[in-house]
Amino acid sequence: MGIFDKFNIEVYNQLVERTKINGEASNMKKKLITALLATSVMSTMFSGCSVSTSTGSTATTDTSTKTESKTTDEATGEEVEITWLFWDDLEATEDLITIGYKQVIDRFNEEYKGKYHVKAITTNLAEYPAKLNALVAAGDVPDVFTCDPGPMLTQYVEAGATADLTDILQNQESEWYGTFSDGIFERLTYDGKIMAVPTCFAAACVFYNTEIFKEVGVEVPETYDQLIDVCKKIKEAGYAPISCSAGTAWCLGMIGGYLCDREGGPDNLKGINDGTLDWTSETFINAGKKLKELSQYFQESAAGDANDIATAHFYNGEAAMLVQGSWAIGQINGSNPAFEEKCGVFRFPGIEGGADPNRMIVKTDNLCMSSKTEHPEACIALMKMFTDDTSEKYIAEVGGKIPVTNVEFDVNKAPKQLSFIQDILSKTTGTLGFYNESLINTEAGDTFNNACVDIFLGTATPEEAFQKIQDHYDKKVRNK
């Protein structure tokens, strides 16, 4: 089952309108934009594996318990414990967003001491989907868990693992619901039912080292051809032009997705999803050829580097550019605070003769509540704290991501990179999700990401790699 959800960049503009700079509203020029965000639903399950936690094993919930029911512990006045599953280590991290989430957990446990207590279960991002899937398959769904929009969320909605939050938000907690930016629940709604709560919003851009650019004597590229020219000059100067993780396939897939969109725009995704366009079409082959050309300017260790390592190459000054989401700001500034002053941001370049170059890859981070939790009141209290003014101000002023509520924050306190991203978004004409998250299901998305890796490694030509995706669609998508 595939759907196209509308995402309105007016959400972002409303947020900026409420932002305060030294007590005054931002005078940034804003453009109202409505864009089609192609997402996909339905997915296959990942292979299961055992759970690694930071505080012990997960608490098993009674899968027959309804979300709306009161709990025995609450009825007797005893402190109840809930679990929250997250994709980073709350104790060892330097990522500023994760540090902020840890503060939420600590604040929650202190404020609700004697009534509620949340136990965080953590893993790394690469293992997170499989571990969450294993818990869902075992009937041990955490009371609250973090989830991406698109196929990842859809699979848990269709499995009945996530609670319908519509009545809670629109009726029981209408004041809380009213704090969110208009339209922010679009990608989290299924058949009119809200299945998750967003915590922050981010956009994928190109981060660059301004000192290296100045040293080499290059300007920010606006087109793909200019980007290649910049890469050549930076490589000649002895730096890695771009740091990228091919070891984390979605990172390479994000670049591949941008190239596909810059070649054919929203028509590419629409055509693939409605069956009127094949992956072997010239628009995709051209994108694959550009991915291969661009990849020769990645760091030498790109094939094996995980995402965190690739990001470290950038903020340690070894690479001049990093294609990543604004979620990376927290990691960059948290790991190397001094780097903030030399970190610029620009939009992924357009292709001359191609499609609209002003479209952006965007996403939200989200919280889901288990449909079988025995403690819905505690879960909602936690989700509310994740999105209260204290948390949302931290998201912007420290973490550099965009709040999902109408909170007013001081841009002067926020990381410099956030203002650059605000400027880019103010000129954005449309949005899309990650390419792999915009296809029919997770298996199709994985096939796309793996094709991008094959092109980079040279194990397949662009024609061969995209033929593999087409073969997958012919056998498992369109031949059903």
Q: Where are the model-predicted features located?
A:
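Extracytoplasmic/periplasmic substrate-recognition and gating elements
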Residues: 80, 107-114, 215-216, 289, ...
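Hinge/lid segment of periplasmic solute-binding proteins
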Residues: 124, 148-205, 219, 228, ...
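A structural signal for short loop-to-beta-strand junctions that line the ligand-binding cleft
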Residues: 135, 142-143, 173-212, 240-244, ...
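C-terminal capping/gating helix-and-loop segments adjacent to ligand/active sites or protein-protein/ligand interfaces
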Residues: 189, 361, 401-407, 420-474
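Glycine-centered hinge/linker elements that transmit conformational signals in sensory
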Residues: 231-233, 273-303
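Short, solvent-exposed loop/beta-turn-alpha elements that line the ligand-binding surface or hinge
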Residues: 166-180, 263-286, 334-338, 350-358, ...
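Extracytoplasmic/periplasmic solute-binding protein
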Residues: 190-199, 204, 228-276, 319
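Conserved N-terminal structural module of periplasmic/extracytoplasmic solute-binding proteins
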Residues: 4, 12, 20, 34-35, ...
